[in-house]
């Protein structure tokens, strides 16, 4: 991915890019509670004006607080269930798989088709991490998930939609 990626965005896609930016910027801070290497790696490859996200410190602090809490919960679950299957519902541009991967988990990133299209422009995901482009309200997505071990469902992305 040497060229800059220019995603076509509108509406809630703005929020996912701003959240992605907030995690990347926080990861560069001196006293961070998590380091999001994937966000740091990819944020500069995205051709997008992040100035709104840079100015919105309240939104950024909310993203960071949620990330710290959810990371801890997911980490604890994976430590107890190392061969688990995780479904990240309304994933947006979440990079938690890359922070939590133990080499065994199976991870599904689920979101609306237009969101997954943007995600697929930015991430090259395959193997134990894959994407499902379908509404969380459509029960058909469950047919795409191959369960291995215990299941964890993350709904952090749904908690940010107003």
Predicted segments — roles?
Residues 131, 140-142, 160-162:
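A short, conserved alpha-helix within the catalytic core of class I
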Residues 137:
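Adenine-nucleotide cofactor-binding loop residues
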């Amino acid at each position: 991915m040497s060229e800059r990626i220019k995603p076509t965005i509108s509406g809630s896609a703005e929020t996912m890019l701003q959240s992605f930016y907030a995690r990347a910027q926080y990861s560069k801070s001196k006293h961070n509670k998590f380091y999001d290497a994937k966000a740091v790696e990819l944020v500069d490859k995205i051709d997008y004006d992040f100035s709104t996200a840079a100015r919105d410190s309240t939104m950024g602090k909310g993203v960071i607080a949620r990330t710290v809490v959810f990371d801890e919960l997911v980490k604890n679950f994976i430590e107890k269930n190392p061969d688990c299957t995780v479904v990240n519902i309304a994933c947006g541009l979440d990079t938690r798989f890359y922070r939590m991967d133990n080499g065994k988990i199976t991870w599904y990133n689920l979101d609306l088709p237009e969101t997954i299209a943007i995600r697929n422009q930015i991430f090259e995901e395959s193997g134990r991490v894959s994407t499902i482009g379908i509404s969380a309200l459509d029960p058909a997505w469950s047919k795409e998930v191959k369960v291995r071990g215990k299941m964890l469902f993350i709904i952090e992305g749904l908690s940010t939609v107003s």
